[in-house]
Amino acid sequence: MDKFVTHLGKIMPLRRSDVDTDQIIPAVYLKRVTRTGFEDGLFSAWREDPGFVLHNPAHAGATILVAGPNFGTGSSRQHAVWALRDWGFKVVI
């Protein structure tokens, strides 16, 4: 993610708690050798649900992800950050 002081953008609420890095991007997507192109793996298991927030047109173009408690727990993997960035998020709260 890029460093900045102020960011104004559209929010996307992720109303889930205890989201670990394997839910953010499953291990099957970690085989790439580049640091880009991970957006297809972002929340891939949940994206099968047509009601999942990423499919909501009201949140299209959101750059701020409002996450629940314990977001990003689990094994350390920079791919989770890359997937969020590649989707277009600039801020995670």
From Swiss-Prot:
InterPro entries listed in its UniProt record: Aconitase/3IPM_dehydase_swvl, AconitaseA/IPMdHydase_ssu_swvl, LeuD
GO MF term list: 3-isopropylmalate dehydratase activity
Organism domain of life: Bacteria
Substrates-to-products reaction catalysed: (2R,3S)-3-isopropylmalate = (2S)-2-isopropylmalate
Enzyme Commission no: 4.2.1.33
Pathway recorded for this protein: Amino-acid biosynthesis; L-leucine biosynthesis; L-leucine from 3-methyl-2-oxobutanoate: step 2/4
Keywords for the protein's UniProt record, in alphabetical order: Amino-acid biosynthesis, Branched-chain amino acid biosynthesis, Leucine biosynthesis, Lyase
Disulfide bonds: none
Protein's job: Catalyzes the isomerization between 2-isopropylmalate and 3-isopropylmalate, via the formation of 2-isopropylmaleate.
Family: Belongs to the LeuD family. LeuD type 1 subfamily.
The protein's name: 3-isopropylmalate dehydratase small subunit
Organism from which the protein derives: Actinoplanes teichomyceticus
